[in-house]
């Protein structure tokens, strides 16, 4: 399974946030899908988007929920230096 999150260039994040988001999202997805050797990438693009390749519709929905939970809890796991 391959997961790609794009964040609109018009809403820049603090330094280090892209890498931190990718790491936290990978950790949470690995916890929810322990048999998955999936790759998670987070990058800037023209618009916000979530792309999940090689997953069932139900898995895509769960990954979308995990992304939402991760984003909403950023104050708990992101430390800006």
UniProtKB/Swiss-Prot annotation:
Residue ranges of the TM segments: none
One example of a Gene Ontology biological process annotation: SOS response
Domain of life: Bacteria
Signal peptide span: none
Keywords in alphabetical order: DNA damage, DNA repair, SOS response
Molecular function, one GO term: enzyme binding
InterPro entries: DinI-like_sf, DNA_damage-inducible_DinI-like
Disulfide-linked positions: none
Function noted in UniProt: Involved in SOS regulation. Inhibits RecA by preventing RecA to bind ssDNA. Can displace ssDNA from RecA.
Family, per entry: Belongs to the DinI family.
Protein name, as recorded: DNA damage-inducible protein I
Organism: Escherichia coli (strain K12)
Gene: dinI
